């Protein structure tokens, strides 16, 4: 009887000790809003901070490499910030507050951008009936060149896209994607790529001009895929 009691006591001590020394874990899931473009190689770096100090780094070109799912084990209580750059080189972050020893899960979207504050200034968003917004695109690289255009117009409550002389109406998802592209052009930061994408957006007497040298965003080609339009090469 004494032996059984002692054994149960020993098991209880071990259990309490293990529970006391256990730590939390965070699983970072990398996802994409655009299911047509899920290239992990376009995410160059992820940094994890605890209470303001960096504790882990992941990269596209050096170990430990960025993977679709990243698990951080043996984490003590505290505030953890997951910092990364999206496809237009905006620095974004997610915060996980660890207060107990359990499994935490957080998703980061590599192609998410904080563009919604710019929607009110969008030419397409403010398009009036029987007017048009013109998009001109030119891409030049070491081994390619391309020159294309889209015209967005409005008749009644319907929006239309014209490409290569053909026109059709746009659904809500397609219209939102065009507005998103226009807004994200305003957010694109530094580049450094040998490929330069030049955008001009015109509405009446107003015109906006942008250059994308990120080699990550690929906004024009992604939009053409969504609209089911073919690329033109020159």
Language model: regions and residue ranges:
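Short, well-ordered, aromatic-rich surface patches in folded extracellular/luminal domains
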Residues: 94-134, 173, 186-188, 195-234
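Bacterial Sec-dependent N-terminal signal peptides
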Residues: 1-31
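A short, solvent-exposed beta-strand micro-motif common in secreted/extracellular proteins
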Residues: 76-88
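Mature extracytoplasmic domains of secretory-pathway proteins
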Residues: 158-190
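Short, surface-exposed beta-strand/beta-hairpin micro-motifs centered on an aromatic residue
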Residues: 63-74
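Short, solvent-exposed coil/turn segments at beta-strand boundaries
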Residues: 49-53, 76, 99-103, 153-157, ...
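Short amphipathic beta-strand segments in non-cytosolic proteins
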Residues: 45-62
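N-terminal domain-start interaction segment
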Residues: 32-44, 114-166, 191-206, 234
């Amino acid at each position: 009887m004494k032996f059984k009691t002692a054994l149960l006591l020993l098991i209880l001590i071990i259990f309490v000790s293990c529970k006391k020394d256990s730590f939390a874990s965070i699983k970072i899931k990398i996802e994409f809003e655009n299911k047509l473009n899920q290239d992990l190689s376009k995410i160059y770096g992820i940094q994890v901070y605890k209470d303001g100090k960096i504790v882990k780094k992941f990269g596209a070109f050096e170990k430990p490499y960025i993977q679709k799912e990243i698990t951080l084990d043996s984490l003590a209580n505290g505030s953890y910030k997951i910092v990364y750059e999206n496809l237009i080189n905006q620095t974004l972050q997610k915060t996980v507050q660890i207060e107990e020893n359990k499994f935490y899960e957080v998703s980061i979207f590599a192609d998410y951008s904080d563009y919604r504050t710019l929607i009110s200034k969008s030419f397409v968003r403010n398009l009036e009936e029987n007017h048009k917004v013109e998009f001109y695109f030119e891409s030049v690289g070491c081994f390619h060149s391309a020159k294309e255009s889209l015209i967005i117009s409005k008749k009644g409550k319907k929006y239309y896209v014209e490409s290569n002389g053909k026109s059709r109406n746009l659904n809500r998802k397609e219209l939102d994607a065009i507005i998103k592209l226009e807004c994200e052009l305003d957010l694109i930061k530094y580049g450094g790529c040998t490929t330069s994408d030049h955008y001009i957006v015109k509405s009446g007497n107003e015109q906006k001009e942008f250059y994308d040298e990120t080699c990550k965003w690929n906004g024009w080609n992604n939009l053409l895929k969504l609209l089911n339009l073919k690329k033109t090469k020159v």
